[in-house]
Amino acid sequence: MAARLGNITFDCDDALKMAAFWSAVLGRPLDKGSSEVFASIGGADAGRKEPAWYFNKVPEPKQAKNRVHLDLVNPDPAAVDELVQLGAMVTGQHQIPGQHWTVMEDPEGNVFCIANKAFTG
């Protein structure tokens, strides 16, 4: 069996705030009708090439560190500063020969990384 990634879904406290943050990060617009309860990016695009992003308001708070996180790629050194201006927080920086990445948290504390290039091998 082979499956493909169709959507990325976040449980969150404020769906609109989270969707607005990720919309700015990804350079993709919010879908019409997005609200504090449910918001989406790319969900209305039937012919999409990238996964849709969904944000659902849930009553319970985040309890622990993510067991899965997103790895973003942007070679521009200014990308980390731009993410901080959008509301992200830097929690760590790492480097190996030819590769560097910054560990960050989005406005609701979900961990993600941004690297200068995609990880290989």
Locations of the language-model features?
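Short acidic/glycine-enriched loop/turn segments that link adjacent beta-strands
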Residues: 35-38, 64, 96-100
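Active-site beta-strand termini and strand-to-loop segments that position acidic
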Residues: 41-46, 104-107, 117
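Core segments of cupin and vicinal oxygen chelate
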Residues: 2, 9-53, 85
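Vicinal oxygen chelate
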Residues: 14-15, 70-108
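Short, solvent-exposed beta-strand edge segments and adjacent coil->beta transition regions
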Residues: 5-7, 65-69
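A short acidic/small-residue loop/turn micro-motif
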Residues: 98, 118-121
